[in-house]
Amino acid sequence: MVIKLKNKKNDYSKLERKLYMYIVAIVVVAIVFVLYIRSMIRGKLGDWILSILENKYDLNHLDAMKLYQYSIRNNIDIFIYVAIVISILILCRVMLSKFAKYFDEINTGIDVLIQNEDKQIELSAEMDVMEQKLNTLKRTLEKREQDAKLAEQRKNDVVMYLAHDIKTPLTSIIGYLSLLDEAPDMPVDQKAKYVHITLDKAYRLEQLIDEFFEITRYNLQTITLTKTHIDLYYMLVQMTDEFYPQLSAHGKQAVIHAPEDLTVSGDPDKLARVFNNILKNAAAYSEDNSIIDITAGLSGDVVSIEFKNTGSIPKDKLAAIFEKFYRLDNARSSDTGGAGLGLAIAKEIIVQHGGQIYAESNDNYTTFRVELPAMPDLVDKRRS
C-alpha cells in the first residue's frame, strides 16, 4: 500500500532566522578579523619578510624589495580573500558544532518515544514545530497503546463471557439427552419436546462457537473486496424475508422504503453481512410489536441506507458501538449477546467500500445509516 503524504509547509521561521543570523555573523566576523589583522601587521609584516630574505637568503635590500613586491605585495588581495575564506570555513565548523545540539535534542526526544517515558518532549525555542510534532506523535502512540489494551481487555472479557454462555446450552443438551437415554419409553410428545429443546440449544451452541472463530479470525485476516453490480433493493428484500421468523415471533415487522431499480457497486457478500448485522441488532434491541423501517435511496452522489427501530442507545455507548469487542448488552444475555465484532467489522467493510457508517439515537428511536458511493450511471440517470 502506497501512502501519499501531503506536502504541508511547516513554520521553521525561528530556525531560519537564527541560521541566517549565524551566516551573516560568520561573514562579518571573518572580514573584520582579517582586516583587523591586516591593519595590525601593516608595515611590520613587510619588514619581517624583508629581514628574512636578506638574512636567510643573502639577498641585498633592493633584490629583497623586488621579490617582496612581485610575490607578496602585488598579490595582497588574493591573500586577503584566502584568509577570509579560511576564517569563514573555521567559523562554519564552529557553527555546525552548535547546530549539532539540535540533532541531539531530537535524538533525545525520539528516545523518550522509544522508551515510552512519561514526560513531555522539550526542544529549543527554534525547534518548537518539531517539538509539537514529537509530542503529538507521543500522544498518538500512547492513545493507540491504550486502545489496544482496552480492546485486548474487551476481547478477554468476551472470551470469558462466551465460555460461560457455552456452558449453559451444553449443560442443557447433556441433561435432555441423558433423559432421552434413560427413558426410551418416554411418551412421543414429551420426547419430541425434549428433542426440539435440545436442537435449539445445539443451534445456540453452534452460534457461540462461530463467535469464538470470529474472534480468532478478526486480527488474522484482511478484508478483501470482490466488487460487482448489486441489486440493492432485491438484497434488502431477501434479507428481510430471512429475518421474518425471528421478527414475527415478537410481533415485529421490517418495512422497506426504496426504489426497485436501486443499485450499487460493491461486494455482495460483505455488504449483506453489514446489513444483516444492523438488522440483527435492530431485531434484538427494538420493542415488541414495533416496525423496523429500512429506507434506501440516492442522495447526491451517495446511496444512503437507513435502519430505524424503536428503542434508544445511551450517548456513552453510542460513541463506542463501532469498536471491536464492544457489546451493548452488559448483562451478556445468551440470546442476544455476541462477540461484539459485528458492527466493528461492518464499519471496516463500509470504509473499504469508500463509504461511511454512523448511528444516531434519541429517547424513542435509533437509526443506523450507511452511505456508499453511487455509481456514475445511476447519478446521471437520476439527474436526467
Swiss-Prot record:
It comes from the Bacteria. It catalyses: ATP + protein L-histidine = ADP + protein N-phospho-L-histidine. This is Sensor protein VanS. The chain crosses the membrane at residues 21-41, 76-96. It is an enzyme of class 2 (transferase). SMART domains: HATPase_c, HisKA. Pfam families: HATPase_c, HisKA. It is found in: Membrane. Residues 221-384 are annotated as: Involved in low-affinity ATP-binding. Exhibits higher affinity for ATP than GTP. One of its GO terms (cellular component) is plasma membrane. GO terms for molecular function: ATP binding; phosphoprotein phosphatase activity; phosphorelay sensor kinase activity. One of its GO terms (biological process) is cell wall organization. It comes from Enterococcus faecium. The modification Phosphohistidine is found at residue 164. Residues 161-376 form the Histidine kinase domain. Induction: Up-regulated by vancomycin. Its EC number is 2.7.13.3. Autophosphorylated. Phosphorylation of VanR inhibited by EDTA. Keywords: Antibiotic resistance, ATP-binding, Cell wall biogenesis/degradation, Kinase, Membrane, Nucleotide-binding, Phosphoprotein, Plasmid, Transferase, Transmembrane, Transmembrane helix, Two-component regulatory system. Member of the two-component regulatory system VanS/VanR. Functions as a sensor protein kinase which is autophosphorylated at a histidine residue in response to environmental stimuli, such as glycopeptide antibiotics. VanS transfers its phosphate group to transcriptional regulatory protein VanR, thereby modulating expression of target genes. Binds directly to, and autophosphorylation activity is enhanced by, the glycopeptides vancomycin and teicoplanin, in vitro.
